[in-house]
Amino acid sequence: MTAPASKLLQPITVGPLELKNRIMFPPLTTGYEERDGSIGERSLAFYERLARGGVSYIVIGDVAPVMTASPTPKLATDAQIPTFKALADTVHKHGAKVALQLFHPEYDVPGVGRMVMGSMAAAKAAQEAKAAGDEETFAAKMAESNEIRNQAYAKLHHDMQHFVNEASVEQLTQIKEAIAASAARAQQAGIDAIEVHGDRLVGSLCSAILNQRTDEYGGSFENRVRYALEVVAAIKEAAPQLMVEYKLPVIMENPDGTPRGKGGLQPDEACEFAKLLEGAGIDMIQVAQANHTGNMGDTIPPMGAMPYNWTLPVAERVKALVSVPVATVGRVVSVEAGEKILEDGAADIIAYGRSLMCDPDIALKAATGEPIRECLNCNKGCVDAIQNRKYISCVLNAENGDEATIAIKPGEGDKKIAVVGGGIAGLEAARVAAKRGYDVTVYEASDHLGGQIVLAAAPPRKDEIMRSVEYYEKILPGLGVKVELNHAASPADLNAADAAIVAVGAHDVVIPVPGADSEKVVSSWDVLAGKVELTGRAAVIGGGLVGTETAEYLLQHGCQVAIVEMLDKIAAGESETILPLIMSDFAEHNVEQHVKTRLTAITDEGVEAICTTEDGAEEPVKIACDYVVMAVGSKANAFDLDGVTVPVTCVGDCSGERTADIASAIRTAYHAANEL
């Protein structure tokens, strides 16, 4: 337990709203809305869970005021008002306030929409022709449909790059009017606030980099911010009862001093604009990173890419210039960090985005001092999903996105549960079983908890993964869970319980090629565990997650590295927000990347392999090296169940469902423990 928070839990007045604390859920695109953009049961359950956890202010991200093809919420017609009223009513039950972040995508929505509808109409005609046996018309209409669709995609791609400069004043006026109309609908639905999405189209117009217009919306600073101020005025006129917040996108600096982002404003201009926003009647300003680079990791950076609280310096500057509340967002992962920011007067409100997905009870736990499950900033379940237009989730929170159907159930009587293995799956199983009221003992054969997480934390930028293990080390004693280290569980240990969960993980494997038994061959797991220290040239066999991370680890320790990968891509499955960092590291250190290459032998000089060329031919490859590091996957560990008489469930890697995946380990463990 830690000391309860004080500053975070203080109420604050924001315009017409009284927020019960300083904890905010910032806008994140969830993908949970219905296909027509309305708020359905999945969205309601997700946002209600946040409100029930004590969050005072929730912002629904990327709400479109027009019917776009974009997979986001939409409040474009009066018919959608009832679902947003249901959202407001649901959140209000728990004392929270809710805002809609209104945005417009950077493209000609009607134009693209007409093309998409034309493609669909041609496809429908094709199917009708096929049903009538008219193959000639079917082929012609399908070709027409595909051609129109390709034209729509081409226009969409073009507009995303150039719409800011090509949009007519009439189009901009129509967009502004649509945003205002959506705000009026939000007010009618009982929504509490509107957040102006200062990025996207609005931010592009503000940007000296992207805005090349020569009319009243381009050129000078005053012209570039003109449209944003007009949007604010239109919203305030259309929905005078609502609090109006502005998400202020700023081009921050990378650790090396280079600018980060294109849309939005430079810090000095952002500070000047903040004063104009206050003069325009804005009730609150959220200082955030500008987007428009094509990679969500630039806006929501993964672990190790940017410092903690990385946007705070600009937020602090803005706060010194305005009298309205200022929110900060960006890698604030702990209650203690939020408290310190508020105590220092650097901001007024703390936006916990990914952190609240990981643990929606941050506010409740801040009041009691109970440890929170801190976000890893891995971006695997959340930001990658936003990037790829999928449902977001959190690798550590098995309930994420399924709050309507999943919750820890009360236990069924007094039961003793034996958990074999203290890796991440075993620890999650122990937590859930203990939460259900069961008497839980964890048996771990080694002298520490964490299993493969300890290895995963060894490569550069990955040490934050250890927060997952540290959470269990903090919380399990308070739940009454007994942990026995250096104890290899026996059948007697399991039989002393009423049921057992086996989470003994997996072990790495070696490709059985000539020379695989050479002394120069080492395991990637042993490298990451620090059991072997390599120097000179290393050939890493396997370019998946473990292989690429091992390669980075070796680079950090001064080795020259080559990677041999059978697939046509290095680091398949890695977070798309982390991958650019890895590739940059490889380029800087001249890492050889041999894709579509199969290991055939290990020799005294190095390794021999076969590379499949683009035309399908096979060519021999020889790579000189001092060491060969095997990173070719893992195999589930076996656990001897002879003599075990109680029910046993295998979870995590040893279940065979999927290896080397923290999300799968957590989810299999959660569900197994919840069914005991």
Report residues per predicted region.
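Rossmann-like dinucleotide-binding cores of NAD(P)H-dependent redox enzymes
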Residues: D439-L479, A551-L599, S655-R658
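Rossmann-like dinucleotide/flavin-binding elements
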Residues: G411-A445, E484-A492, A496, A503-V513, ...
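A generic structural signal for alpha->beta connector loops
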Residues: G95, Q241, S323, A346-A347, ...
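Flavin-dependent oxidoreductase catalytic cores
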Residues: M1-V420, I424, E428-K435, D439-V440, ...
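Generic beta-strand/beta-sheet core signal
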Residues: P26, Q101, V196-D199, K247-P249, ...
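A generic local structural motif
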Residues: Q10-I12, L44-A45, C271-E272, P313-A315, ...
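Hydrophobic, well-ordered secondary-structure elements that form the walls
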Residues: I285, V318, I341, G353, ...
